[in-house]
């Protein structure tokens, strides 16, 4: 990327309003090669983001090696993209059906230990720390597809996009989970590791008589079994956890040292985080999910709407920062990724640094337009006029 002085945030001689200025990048659903990750980090650094939340595991992809579990990447790293028309409602205008044309390799691959260490160092040189996410106990479908005994024993023959996506409370699953977090701690120096904690369907656990007879009498208790073991592993390495706000279903008061990401829509995530007593990050799905395109003919209108909503939302006790979110279920190529991120990521940068002292929109909009002119010359950016 050509070096020019960034216009946003508008005054970085002031201290930042948010200590956590993050972007979630989803490499589980679409595998982003190392050069794409480098370019993302370069863009983040330009606008003073300091946390890359790296979503590395989910139902449709497992992207990091775990010693002793070679099938994680051999099988879990090569799950075909789900052929479903629901993508069409999520894609940018004019990209209907684009998932059908996406190259097969977009869901194939994993990051070697050397790749990860390189990107950690690349990020650190730009004042960014990488916070990896290993999703437990739900959103584990890729791991279960590779090792079916980790999931529900009644669903061992389910397809990878089927319902067997939650770790089963067994010695094998707990050992696997520990191995994954031990290895993550060896690769990522971040003091915080994200453990997932997204909403888990407790029904299969609670309806299993053998689990009930073993004394595992509620979904909340079983989820705590997984989370407590993960935290014990992190604490062994001197780390602490971040988790989605859904963790409060099992822990109304989260374990000490845990940071929550308030993500559930309709203010549910915010309410859970605010009432938890834990420090929290605003990652509101209604405001900050940039992989949902703004449905408008004006390129700046979605950025304007986001800016108005965000500057009002960045208030609250124990609020430590803000995180934009880019899921990759329907974002399948680098040009489409940057199309979704920009220009809205620029207004997140301004609000994250300046908070209530952000420029008013009439002064901010020209700077956004100038930055976009620069970015379109230097990064892959989908042109809606030439789909």
Question: What spans do the regions from the language model cover?
Answer:
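Feature activates predominantly on carbohydrate-active enzymes
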Residues: 1-164, 171-174, 182-192, 233, ...
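Generic recognition of stable, solvent-exposed alpha-helical segments in well-folded globular domains
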Residues: 39, 111-118, 172-179, 222-229, ...
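Active-site neighborhood of glycoside hydrolase catalytic domains
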Residues: 143-257, 264-277
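Flexible, acidic glycine-rich loops studded with aromatic residues
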Residues: 241-258, 263-387
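A cross-domain feature marking catalytic cores of carbohydrate-active enzymes
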Residues: 25-27, 56-58, 132-136, 197-199, ...
């Amino acid at each position: 990327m050509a070096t020019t002085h960034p216009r946003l945030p508008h005054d970085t001689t002031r201290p930042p309003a948010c200590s956590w200025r993050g972007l979630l990048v989803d490499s589980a659903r679409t595998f982003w090669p190392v050069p794409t990750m480098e370019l993302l980090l370069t863009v983040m650094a330009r606008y003073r983001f300091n946390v890359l939340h790296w979503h590395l595991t989910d139902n449709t992809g497992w992207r990091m090696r775990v010693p002793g579990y070679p099938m994680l990447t051999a099988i879990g790293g090569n799950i075909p993209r789900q052929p479903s028309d629901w993508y069409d409602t999520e894609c940018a205008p004019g990209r209907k059906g684009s998932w059908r044309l996406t190259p097969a390799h977009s869901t194939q691959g994993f990051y070697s230990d050397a790749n990860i260490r390189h990107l950690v160092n690349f990020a650190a040189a730009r004042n960014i720390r990488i916070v990896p996410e290993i999703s437990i106990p739900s959103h584990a479908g890729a791991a279960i597809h590779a090792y079916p005994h980790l999931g529900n024993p009644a669903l061992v023959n389910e397809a990878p996009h089927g319902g067997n996506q939650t770790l089963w409370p067994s010695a094998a699953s707990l050992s696997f989970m520990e191995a994954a977090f031990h290895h993550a701690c060896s690769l990522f120096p971040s003091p915080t590791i994200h453990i997932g904690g997204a909403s888990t369907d407790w029904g299969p656990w609670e309806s299993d008589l053998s689990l009930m007879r073993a004394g595992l009498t509620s979904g909340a208790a079983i989820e705590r079994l997984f989370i407590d073991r993960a935290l014990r592993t992190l604490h062994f390495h001197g780390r602490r956890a971040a988790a989605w706000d859904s963790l409060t279903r099992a822990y109304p008061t989260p374990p000490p040292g845990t940071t929550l990401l308030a993500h559930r829509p309709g203010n549910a995530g915010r309410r859970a985080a605010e009432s938890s007593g834990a420090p929290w990050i605003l990652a509101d799905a209604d405001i900050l999910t940039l992989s949902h395109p703004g449905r408008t003919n004006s390129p700046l209108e979605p950025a304007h709407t986001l800016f108005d909503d965000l500057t009002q939302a960045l208030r609250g006790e124990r609020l430590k920062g803000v995180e934009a979110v880019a899921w990759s279920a329907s974002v399948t190529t680098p040009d489409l990724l940057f199309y979704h991120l920009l220009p809205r990521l620029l207004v997140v940068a301004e609000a994250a640094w300046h908070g209530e002292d952000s420029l008013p929109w009439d002064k901010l909009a020209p700077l956004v337009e100038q930055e976009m002119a620069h970015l379109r010359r230097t990064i892959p950016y989908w042109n809606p006029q030439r789909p």
